[in-house]
Curated annotation (Swiss-Prot):
Keyword Methyltransferase appears in the UniProt entry: no
GO CC, any one term: endoplasmic reticulum
InterPro entries linked to this entry: TPX2_C, WVD2/WDL1-4
Molecular function GO labels: microtubule binding
Name recorded for this polypeptide: Protein WVD2-like 4
GO BP, sorted A to Z: microtubule cytoskeleton organization; protein localization to membrane
Keyword Iron: no
Species, as recorded: Arabidopsis thaliana
Length: 432
């Protein structure tokens, strides 16, 4: 058993070395693939039908990625074999050819994508889903097979197939023809645009050239006419005459303009003078009218009517100065009998209400004020006494005259005297 295990390990090591050698060989394949892609490009130029056949072949191939993976999984399992020499099996060949190293694989995919990008859009597909069989072309040869092997693992990157109508399914050649016609139309359109630009430039040159020629011819004619007119004596005379006539007309027109402007200035000045005169007259007339109105407004007063009488003159009334009666102080009150000298003199009695009201009022005045009030009260009492004495004297004089004139009518006169004395006493009390 131990010897068999050693043989199996040795065989597996040899197999790994063979795989590495095969991978190293595959590393040198991209150069050959590049040549093959160039050949395929030349083959594409020969005709679009070969491209369609190649694409159909690539579609018919089975997915090599999945099959190879299954094969490698089987190879990785330990296989028990009897003792013997290790022979190179086709499994290892398929593995080495389909799975090169990573760097080479990435480069191959890029180159294969570059080689097959123009092919993906040219897949002819029938509406029913059946794929047309294409005859293999003899011109492509082995290079087409190599490109198909490289592009086989890239089947997943191809564009998804869309269902096409029955009219489009009549043949793939119609699509190819349409695309060719489109490319031809685009090329012709570009050429037409270039030709149109060149023609417009030529037309512009042609249009500008005759204009320049006409301008040059006009300048030549002008120079010729001036030289002929100045060279000949008749031309000189005519030019001198025309210049003199033209200058004479200019002078006449200038004189007429001056006269016209002078007349306009005179008219304007006259209008301004008239305006000033009218304004002055209007001011004078306004002043005169105002004076007339003032004179017309003045009128003479007519005589007063007979029934109108002036009111009598008002009599000026002498106002008696108002004085406040001040109540005398209690305890210092003098009797009225002391003031009056006799029975004939009327007694002055003050109302009780005023005395009672004065008694009820409390005394809250200070001493200096009381002294001043006492002095004023004494002065007033003296004045009253003097007046009463004068009244009594007058009454006595009247009595004497009355007795001398009419001794019989003494009684009524005495009554009248008493009434007058009472009136005078009341006046004295109010006035004092």
């Amino acid at each position: 058993m131990a010897s068999e295990d050693l043989n199996i390990v040795a065989e597996s090591k040899k197999g790994e070395e063979n795989v590495i050698v095969d991978n190293s060989k595959d590393m040198n394949r991209p150069e050959n693939l590049d040549l093959s892609t160039e050949k395929t490009d030349t083959a594409n130029e020969n005709g679009p039908k070969d491209e369609a056949s190649k694409l159909v072949k690539e579609a018919d191939l089975p997915e090599s990625g999945t099959s190879v993976k299954s094969k490698t999984a089987k190879d990785n399992k330990p296989v028990k074999r009897k003792s013997g020499t290790f022979s190179r099996s086709p499994r290892f060949m398929s593995q080495s050819s389909s799975f090169p190293t990573k760097g080479a694989y990435t480069d191959i995919t890029r180159k294969s994508i570059d080689a097959t990008t123009s092919k993906t859009s040219l897949k002819p597909v029938v509406a029913g889903g059946s794929k047309p069989k294409a005859t293999p072309s003899s011109s492509s040869g082995v290079s087409a097979k190599r490109t198909s092997l490289v592009s086989a693992p890239l089947k997943k990157q191809t564009m998804p197939v869309k269902t096409i109508s029955k009219d489009a399914a009549s043949g793939p050649t119609s699509k190819l023809g349409d695309e060719g016609s489109k490319s031809i139309k685009e090329e012709t359109a570009g050429k037409d645009v270039e030709e149109a630009g060149s023609t417009t430039a030529v037309v512009a040159d042609k249009v500008s050239n005759p204009l320049k020629a006409e301008m040059a011819s006009k300048d030549d004619e002008d120079t010729r006419s001036t030289t002929t007119s100045t060279s000949t004596p008749r031309g000189r005379r005519s030019s001198v005459g025309s210049a003199s006539g033209f200058s004479f007309r200019l002078e006449e027109r200038a004189e007429k303009r001056k006269e016209f402007y002078m007349k306009l200035e005179e008219k304007i000045h006259a209008k301004e003078v008239e305006k000033t005169n009218l304004q002055a007259k209007s001011k004078e007339s306004q002043e005169e009218e105002i004076k007339r109105l003032r004179k017309s407004l003045t009128f003479k007063a007519g005589p007063m009517p007979s029934f109108y009488k002036e009111p009598p003159p008002k009599v000026e009334l002498k106002k008696i100065p108002t004085t406040r009666p001040k109540s005398p102080k209690l305890g210092r009150r003098k009797s009225s009998s002391d003031a009056t000298g006799g029975e004939a003199a009327p007694r002055v009695t003050k109302p009780k209400d005023s005395s009672s009201s004065t008694v009820k009022k409390p005394i809250t005045k200070s001493q200096p004020k009381l002294e001043t009030q006492e002095k004023s009260v004494k002065a007033k009492e003296k004045k009253k006494k003097v007046k009463k004495e004068e009244a009594e004297k007058r009454g006595e004089e009247e009595k004497a005259t009355a007795v001398a004139a009419k001794p019989e009518e003494q009684k009524p006169n005495s009554n009248n005297i008493q009434v007058k004395a009472e009136i005078m006493a009341s006046e004295v009390v109010v006035g004092g």
